[in-house]
A protein has these predicted regions:
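C-terminal functional regions that serve as terminal interaction/effector modules
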Residues: 1-2, 155-191
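Glycine-rich beta-strand-turn "strand-cap" elements at beta-sheet edges
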Residues: 24-40, 61-99, 139-152, 177-191
Length: 191
């Protein structure tokens, strides 16, 4: 891709943009250029239909630019109401809210011990966890569920215009009791 002539890049970018704009799915694009050694960008697909996502990706792969794409990571998850939340809210990408400047995406796996705890004990810890998040209104959390359809329990996507606020949030969350039950929360993909 980097070796293509500028005009060819421009034309292939238009081709790709047309597919994304006309896709039967929502697509958000983010740059990871210089932030990761395994990818230059992230594509976030949202749809009621896995088949629509697959069809869109297939069309992308058939473009001039798409022939150069090699996925470094693929994650699958779905939206559903939280069993711990006092009130459930719609995710920013579902409501059509404009994306923030940054998104930090990562897979999340809790320990087996977490799921063996009584529900009320887990709920108390999750309430503390939620209250910590409420101190950072400038950071929007999108939690989606991967149980049974991918390798992790959840996919988290934090959106913010301020990476320092996100970092402060994560540092505070590490001090919550629930953090003792985190098995995996990497890789962190900053876009």
């Amino acid at each position: 891709w980097r070796w293509m002539a500028d005009l060819a890049k421009e034309e292939s970018a238009k081709e790709l943009e047309s597919i994304i704009q006309n896709a039967p799915v929502k697509v958000r694009t983010y740059s990871t250029l210089g932030l990761r050694d395994d990818a230059d960008f992230l594509l976030w697909f949202m749809s009621e239909s896995i088949e629509d996502i697959q069809e869109t990706i297939s069309k992308i792969y058939h473009t001039v630019a798409g022939k150069y794409f090699i996925p470094s990571r693929v994650y699958l998850s779905s939206t559903r109401p939280s069993i711990y939340a006092r009130k459930n809210r719609l995710h920013s990408f579902v409501t059509g809210m404009d994306p923030k400047k940054y998104v930090v995406v990562y897979p999340f796996i809790k320990t087996r011990e977490w799921y063996l705890l009584p529900f009320e004990q887990r709920k108390i810890m999750m309430d503390e966890h939620s209250k910590t998040g409420e101190k950072f209104p400038q950071v929007e959390l999108n939690t989606t569920y991967s149980f049974g359809i991918h390798d992790e329990d959840f996919m988290l996507a934090f959106e913010s215009d301020d990476l320092h606020a996100f970092q402060d949030l994560i540092m505070d969350l590490r001090q919550n009791k629930v953090s003792a039950y985190v098995a995996v929360d990497t890789p962190m993909i900053v876009c």
